[in-house]
């Protein structure tokens, strides 16, 4: 088995999918898991990007089906901007599409800035822009877990195969969640699910960005990665890609393995 095939298997990627069937499987997963845990629903941060829009709509469909079947479940969508978000219109469009039971807005700027200032005062140096970006991601997850804890809700994560293969997420930030309904999907497969669900094309054709850096606001994921999502998707779907691209992907996969594992102990062997 080639490394490419091993990665596809490890990340549960199918080269060809039926969007309608995938929607059904993922809604059923959300329903089954929330019932098993005894939780009362879900909470998810909504950025206006493809991934949170898709995960949010799946979550809302799941809780509506649970209620229609006589159960009790709710979904809270959370806007988590740092000051003013330049693509706020897209975030609002996503909320309109998702139709969450409840939506709230929580500006993380005061919390992040207070922490950054305290860090500088105590340690005598400023956080790097990259490190501060990770703080933003972790504060967002702290907020979601606070809302989830208050309301007995599970926190949904938006990780999918194209992020997982590169480790392109913040450990214990957007990478920290209770369940991942997009696991195994490539970026283009996620777009196909949103198309099937009737989303406005603005929500899945826009340039993907983590938008965590103050010094490079709105920087494209592909710029930061040095790899395009089409290249990642082709690789993950078993297609041939240029050798240098495959090497970049495989290197990122190898060095980011720790991000796809629970905290290491001396009894684990994945890191050896």
Curated annotation (Swiss-Prot):
GO terms for biological process: NAD biosynthetic process. This is NH(3)-dependent NAD(+) synthetase. GO terms for molecular function: ATP binding; glutaminase activity; metal ion binding; NAD+ synthase (glutamine-hydrolyzing) activity; NAD+ synthase activity. It catalyses: deamido-NAD(+) + NH4(+) + ATP = AMP + diphosphate + NAD(+) + H(+). Disulfide bonds: none annotated. Pathway: Cofactor biosynthesis; NAD(+) biosynthesis; NAD(+) from deamido-NAD(+) (ammonia route): step 1/1. Its EC number is 6.3.1.5. Deamido-NAD(+) binds at residues 138, 171, 178, 258-259. The keyword Metal-binding applies. Belongs to the NAD synthetase family. It comes from the Bacteria. The keyword Glycosyltransferase does not apply. Mg(2+) binds at residues 51, 163. GO terms for cellular component: cytoplasm. InterPro entries: NAD/GMP_synthase (IPR022310), NAD_synthase (IPR003694), NH(3)-dep_NAD(+)_synth (IPR022926), Rossmann-like_a/b/a_fold (IPR014729). ATP binds at residues 45-52, 158, 187, 209. It comes from Bacillus cereus (strain ATCC 10987 / NRS 248). Catalyzes the ATP-dependent amidation of deamido-NAD to form NAD. Uses ammonia as a nitrogen source. The lineage of its organism: Bacteria, Bacillati, Bacillota, Bacilli, Bacillales. Homodimer. Transmembrane segments: none annotated. Gene3D superfamilies: HUPs.
